[in-house]
Amino acid sequence: AGHLALIKNPNSKIIYVPLMDFVRNITTSLRHNTIENVKLFYQSADLLLVDDIHLIAGKDKSQEEFFHIFNFLFSTKKQIIFTCDQPPKNIKDLENRLKTRFSQGLNLQLSPPELEMRAAILLKKSQNPQISLNLSEDVALFIASHVMSNVRDLEGALLKLKAFVDFSQIDHSLITKDVVEGALGDLIKPKK
């Protein structure tokens, strides 16, 4: 969504924030009496992307501030996109006024990516400098055929594989299905 917004308008101000970072920003700003600066920062967005909004449940002060930021962005016709692991109406300890606001927008349930897409995601993410694993297409397909839920689980499998490879001092270019089975034994059931 952020890339598309920049293509449409290269001058767009796009802010992405994982919810727990937002909560930390709010908590710190309240402690240092700089809440207005933080609100102005988020209100300056043309597009605000918030990951894991469900984690705001039970965080009363963060909900209060998010409500005001949301209203400002909505009233100025800015866009807000957030991810959530459930429909907003099902989030316990979420203020009703936020449930109402969240339900006014377009709510989509995203299906897990198909096998080929999961393999492509694994290949792309394995090239990230923090992971830096040399996966063959066959190995990526093998992992993707066993890790079917979501991108986070794919990333988790890659991180677990990297830790195993590093700990076992296996050459990063020699990652085979057997190595994957050793690393991801709880996810990968070897064929008998």
Feature roles, as predicted:
Residues A1-I15:
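Walker A/P-loop
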Residues K8, N25-V50, I56, D60-F72, ...:
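Conserved alpha-helical scaffold flanking the Walker A/P-loop in AAA+ ATPase domains
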Residues Y16-V17, L49-D51, Q79-D85:
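Structural recognition of the conserved hydrophobic beta-strand(s) that form the central parallel beta-sheet
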Residues T27-R31, Q86-Q104:
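Short regulatory helix/loop adjacent to the ATP-binding pocket of P-loop NTPases
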Residues F74, N90-K92, G105-M117:
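Conserved AAA+ ATPase "SRH/arginine-finger" region at the nucleotide-binding site
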Residues Q86, R97, G105, M117-S132, ...:
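Conserved AAA+ ATPase "sensor/coupling" helix adjacent to the nucleotide-binding pocket
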Residues L123-Q127, D138-H146, R152-F167, G182:
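C-terminal helical "lid" of AAA+/P-loop NTPase domains
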Residues A163-K192:
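Conserved alpha/beta core segments of nucleic-acid transaction machinery
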